[in-house]
Curated annotation (Swiss-Prot):
Keywords: Cell membrane, Cell projection, Coiled coil, Cytoplasm, Hearing, Membrane, Synapse. It is found in: Cytoplasm; Cell membrane; Postsynaptic density; Synapse. Disruption phenotype: Homozygous knockout mice exhibit early onset progressive hearing loss. Forms coiled-coil structures coiled-coil structures that mediate homo- and heteromultimerization. Interacts with NFATC2; interaction is reduced by AKT activation. Interacts with NFATC1 and NFATC4. Interacts with DAGLA (via PPXXF motif); this interaction is required for the cell membrane localization of DAGLA. GO terms for biological process: behavioral response to cocaine; calcium-mediated signaling; G protein-coupled glutamate receptor signaling pathway; negative regulation of calcineurin-NFAT signaling cascade; negative regulation of interleukin-2 production; regulation of G protein-coupled receptor signaling pathway; sensory perception of sound. It comes from Mus musculus (Mouse). This is Homer protein homolog 2.
Length: 354
């Protein structure tokens, strides 16, 4: 691979669940670096992501691959060689757009690299065929010239065949030397890449240890802070209880203040009333004197009433006596009147007789 990445971003890496082919399985616990690399030895482009010492993405981009945006911050592509589907979750839509654009560029570059490789293969094949055709022609020309030359006429067909085979072996040897040189270069590149990867792995391991220590420190700090938070929450609970008590006390104080104001108003009214008490007492004494006089008058009146009752009883007795005498008188008078009527009738009868 190339020493420097073509493009680098950060994202959360996912892989499709191989059993269900539907659910996403997180391949990284947090956002990791995802980079495009150009592999010089293989003339190919790759997407590589490493989480600590673990390679979670090593996908070779082919011209028939497609990167699909499934949401504003999530995209995926299928890798048939790895027999899986990779998914990337970005922190913003802009990062997803840049990654998708770079995917299109790299895919087009991979297509061009494949086309060039095919052209070179076809050119090399044609060149080999032309070289193979030229050798029999030269042999045939030598054979023709040999008919004219008496010395050449003595050359056997086996020598001609050996010469042709030697030419072919020279060409193959040249190509083999070139391939060996190319393979040595590729091997050296791979060694350098392995060395860089080993260094990166060692650095990653050291970084992991450092992160572990940092994580342990952070965990201890987190535990301490959690304990502190619990203490503060307990203190807050006590403060809230105290606030509630203070609120109740404030309400009680307000009620007592209201009662005090009412009592002060009552006291003020009583003071006003106490100012008129002497006047009321004098009036009360005056009324008491009048009441005593009225009681004396009432006693006198009662005495008079008793005297009048006695007089009335005597008067009633006299009236009853007079009524009896009057009744006797009226009875006598009625008798006298009856006698007078009889006398008058007698006189009338005497007058009639006369």
């Amino acid at each position: 691979m190339g020493e420097q990445p073509i493009f680098t971003t950060r994202a959360h890496v996912f892989q499709i669940d191989p059993s269900t082919k539907k659910n996403w399985v997180p391949a990284s616990k947090q956002a990791v670096t995802v980079s495009y690399f150009y592999d010089v030895t293989r003339n190919s482009y790759r997407i590589i992501s490493v989480d600590g010492a673990k390679v979670i993405i090593n996908s070779t981009i082919t011209p028939n691959m497609t990167f699909t945006k499934t949401s504003q911050k999530f995209g995926q592509w299928a890798d048939s060689r790895a027999n899986t589907v990779f998914g990337l979750g970005f922190s913003s839509e802009l990062q997803l757009t840049k990654f998708a654009e770079k995917f299109q560029e790299v895919r087009e570059a991979a297509r061009l690299a494949r086309d060039k490789s095919q052209e070179k293969t076809e050119t090399s094949s044609n060149h080999s065929q032309e070289s193979g055709c030229e050798t029999p022609s030269s042999t045939q020309a030598s054979s023709v010239n040999g008919t004219d030359d008496e010395k050449a006429s003595h050359a056997s067909p086996a020598d001609t065949h050996l010469k042709s085979e030697n030419d072919k072996l020279k060409i193959a040897l040249t190509q083999s030397a070139a391939n060996v040189k190319k393979w040595e270069m590729e091997l050296q590149t791979l060694r350098e890449s392995n060395a860089r990867l080993t260094t990166a792995l060692q650095e990653s391991a050291a970084s992991v240890e450092q992160w572990k220590r940092q994580f342990s420190i952070c965990r201890d700090e987190n535990d301490r802070l959690r304990s502190k938070i619990e203490e503060l929450e307990e203190q807050c609970s006590e403060i809230n209880r105290e606030k509630e008590k203070n609120t109740q006390l404030k309400r009680r104080i307000e009620e007592l203040e209201s009662e005090v104001r009412d009592k002060e108003m009552e006291l003020k009214d009583l003071r006003k009333q106490s100012e008129i008490i002497p006047q009321l007492m004098s009036e009360c004494e005056y009324v008491s004197e009048k009441l005593e006089a009225a009681e004396r008058d009432n006693q006198n009146l009662e005495d008079k009433v008793r005297s009048l009752k006695t007089d009335i009883e005597e008067s009633k007795y006299r009236q009853r006596h007079l009524k009896g005498e009057l009744k006797s008188f009226l009875e006598v008078l009625d008798g006298k009147i009856d006698d007078l009527h009889d006398f008058r009738r007698g006189l009338s009868k005497l007058g009639t007789d006369n």
